[in-house]
Amino acid sequence: MAIILDADVLIRGEKGTFNLQQWVAARPTEQFEVAAVTVAEFWHGVERATGARRAKRKQYLQTILASLPVIPYTEQTAYEHARVWAELESAGEMIGYYDIIVAATALERGSKVATFNLRHFAQVKGLAVIEPR
């Protein structure tokens, strides 16, 4: 079962508050991936940054893209996205739209999500969630 890294895991890795490289290296049998929507979130951060910060963020993102497969948003992802969205909305338990897409991507592939935002992702039925340590 692959592990899809949520944006918060990548952000903490970028900021140096979490040693992402060490955590991944300690799990050599695991396949790590990133959802396309997470790449969009990062590009947004790069585009908003200026000067040296922009260059640093861009380099970090390019390193991530060179080392992790990016999982596309497919028609099946769209179905899972709509299903999870409707389920959460009907229950009055909405989470962030990007989080729903990450969850849908994981559900479509039978993957886990690695996140520090356990509270949100735990609301998605059938989703395997792990907190990196």
Regions found by a protein language model. Give the residues of each.
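Short, structured coil segments at secondary-structure junctions
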Residues: P28, A66, V124-K125
